[in-house]
From Swiss-Prot:
Keyword hit for Nucleotide-binding: no
Source organism, top-level taxon: Bacteria
Pathway(s) where this gene product acts: Amino-acid biosynthesis; L-isoleucine biosynthesis; L-isoleucine from 2-oxobutanoate: step 4/4; Amino-acid biosynthesis; L-leucine biosynthesis; L-leucine from 3-methyl-2-oxobutanoate: step 4/4; Amino-acid biosynthesis; L-valine biosynthesis; L-valine from pyruvate: step 4/4
SUPFAM superfamilies, sorted: D-aminoacid aminotransferase-like PLP-dependent enzymes
Name used for this protein in its record: Probable branched-chain-amino-acid aminotransferase
Modified-residue entries (N6-(pyridoxal phosphate)lysine), positions: K202
MF term (GO), any: L-valine-2-oxoglutarate transaminase activity
Organism expressing this protein natively: Streptomyces coelicolor (strain ATCC BAA-471 / A3(2) / M145)
Record-level GO BP terms: isoleucine biosynthetic process; L-leucine biosynthetic process; L-valine biosynthetic process
Keyword Amino-acid biosynthesis: yes
InterPro entries linked: Aminotrans_IV, Aminotrans_IV_CS, Aminotransferase-like, B_amino_transII, BCAT-like_C, BCAT-like_N, BCAT_family
Family in the record: Belongs to the class-IV pyridoxal-phosphate-dependent aminotransferase family.
Signal peptide range in chain numbering: none
Amino acid sequence: MTTPTIELKPSAHPLSDSERAAILANPGFGRHFTDHMVTIKWTEGRGWHDGQLVPYAPLSLDPATMVLHYAQEIFEGLKAYRRPDGSVATFRPEKNGARFQASSRRLGMPELPVDTFIEACDALVAQDEKWVPAHGGEESLYLRPFMIATEVGLGVRPANEYLFIVIASPAGAYFPGGVKPVSIWVSEDRVRAVPGGMGDAKTGGNYAASLLAQAEAAAKGCDQVCYLDAIERKWVEELGGMNLYFVYGNKIVTPSLTGSILEGVTRDSLLTVARDLGYEAEEGRVSVDQWQRDSENGTLTEVFACGTAAVITPVGTVKRAGAQWQQSGGETGEVTQRLRDALLDIQRGTVADPHGWMHTLA
């Protein structure tokens, strides 16, 4: 199968150096976007074609475009980092590309070759390289590849036309004032996904389904919501957009992939990093009752969440119906901080990359 080369059609009017510098001084997250985007089309019978890097601009969609009605949409999230020598590298883009393919299969969409996924990301980062923040802090350039069904029509079936796009947004430090534990509401009424559903696909529908539960968590005074399994309503699965880890002294456990949990790239990486640091890291099942009991008796020493945006987020206060408890006295635990520092050091290029995770742009 042939894949398109990315044709470069750069903007004649990119943002000025001073305008870009003002944004990079306080980028936030997802509020500003670089000068360009990459687009690739897919048409039934023709496959992937017309790969282009073009100026960032709005999309024009017919009101009957199928994605607007039947939600054939998937996305990814990864970061580009400035290295100490001034070069730029992305973190494990092949893992994101493979997960993008898995999401495509689940939603009946065409699979973009992983090499093309990486080529598209590389092309955008290379063109907008000045948008990658300076080395030294936790700032990065966040990449958002996504794909939508663009065929026009109201028939309920897989579309025969799609558009793949990559956009980029400078991202500030997730914890600009230092790492702070988050509070969690354990929802025993709402579920994120069911066996045989789309829980292991990165698709917008899963996030839309989480918004009500997130609002309920906020009403309980919590930052995040934790979901349990859909069958027994007892096994811990994940947060709305992050995986969870439980620390039992030298043993670290993350919920096993069940088909209803998203296979996070950070989650996978931390299993390896933890073992490199001498911890016993494994996948297993943790019930919410066990979580509460082991926290209260002191055997569960720390809990943290992980994902691309924040890397690692310590868990402080946990609430469920009729109960409340704290992890690590509401502070960031020693193991949590050690793992966070170790992974960030690899991503920022301040230590060796023993597993070849960083993809440096030529």
